[in-house]
Amino acid sequence: MTDLNDNICKRYIKMITNIVILSLIICISLAFWIMSMTASTYYGNLRPISPWRWLFSVVVPVLIISNGLKKKSLDHSGALGGLVVGFILTIANFSFFTSLLMFFLSSSKLTKWKGEMKKRLDSEYKEGGQRNWIQVFCNGAVPTELALLYMIENGPGEIPVDFSKQYSASWMCLSLLAALACSAGDTWASEVGPVLSKSPPRLITTWEKVPVGTNGGVTVVGLVSSLLGGTFVGIAYFLTQLIFVNDLDISAPQWPIIAFGGLAGLLGSIVDSYLGATMQYTGLDESTGMVVNSPTNEAKHIAGKPILDNNAVNLFSSVLIAVLLPTAAWGFWPRG
């Protein structure tokens, strides 16, 4: 009887807690909406954000991050960082949100996939991924900065990617997509390549065979996976455009977004591999037979210099792809 009462009490407390949290979220959303209305009235040229958009931008990232924390895809610092990134991208543009969501969900699933095998190959493997705030920052800082610039330039809302009508906003949209597709491509290649590839990876700078897990090591399976990862994010962006953008019939075709995402994923993985092969240390610990990312007395050098760590390589790759690819795409993008 005591156990039954305890269970009822726990359920009641959980229900009350959820109600309190939901009430706080609604209050926060309304407060943001009131501030946006006040700013719109005061400055005149600012478009107010609807209360539903505020509510969605607060509630949905909280639910997703809570689930990620529960499944160990994020640690507590990563969850806080993810909330900031998720909120800003969602309030700015729902196409940004769905791209981020597909990157996060697919990466989390693939990280857990064949976890026992990866644990034997990677000395730094963590169950579920457990990404911290540094990893969230290195993958999310560029998209977050671009989302803020997008809101300053265009205001919150979805627009067609059309260089002939809105060059700056379209450039920022593609730049943000490129950064997310780059991160997705690298993650898919890292998680799928070592598991499915039948042949050993080759160092991208010398094309020599290297142990699985070597920074800068590439396989055909990994490169194809990076292409698919970027394409997956591009499809999410494209489908959201079809749902939320109203004037697609008088705008440039949006289907190149899918191809752009795939290209960003593939090139991002290649850039990441090159930086990893040259500026990130890789050694083979002869006592354990595992690949390590920092010099030790037991480690035999394989490739790279200890200049950057994996997070810094991810950040630099994201920046390079986000800056260069939209500029190149401008010359080939269909005009409306």
Swiss-Prot record:
Gene symbol of the encoding locus: TMEM19
Annotated protein name in UniProt: Transmembrane protein 19
GO cellular component term, pick one: membrane
Keyword Coiled coil: no
Membrane topology qualifier: Multi-pass membrane protein
Transmembrane stretches, start-end: 15-35, 49-69, 84-104, 218-238, 257-277, 313-333
Entry-linked InterPro entries: DUF92_TMEM19
Family named by the database record: Belongs to the TMEM19 family.
Compartments in which it is found: Membrane
Taxonomic lineage: Eukaryota, Metazoa, Chordata, Craniata, Vertebrata
Keywords carried by this UniProt record: Membrane, Transmembrane, Transmembrane helix
